[in-house]
Amino acid sequence: VLLINLKWWRENNICNNFIEYLKCHDNLKFVDQDILNGMFYSSRKLIPFKWNVQDGFLRRKPKIRKSCIPTLQNEIKSPAIIHYTGSRKPWDYDCINPYKESYFKYLDMTKWKHTRPYMPLKFKFKLMLDKVLYFLYLKPRKYIKISK
């Protein structure tokens, strides 16, 4: 998540600086992110996790520094921005992100109200079976449980 001072960017000709950076670094994997990280690393400001709650933060074993986990666990309970990262998006029938329903809450405020992905019967059965296995502690959950 980015908060950008566009006036400052324009006054400091940042777009041209991006182009120059790209000319000197032609092997970037995530071009936009790599340029931003390379140019602004020393002046970046970290924001609380609740402003960028990502899929990896919601896993039972979060992909984050261990020292940050207590803060993260508190902040993901009431996110300000849910960033649906990763390959499975809430509009995919096989998404099991705990905040999937939040996506549909806001989708229902648009002209696509009540639009839901088609879920094959086979997957519905798998979801029910997984719930039983979680309940009996025979299968670990991939995601933490979010209290509503």
At which residue positions do the language-model features occur?
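A glycosyltransferase accessory/donor-loop signature
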Residues: 4-148
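A recurrent flexible, glycine/aromatic-enriched loop bordering the glycosyltransferase active site
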Residues: 1
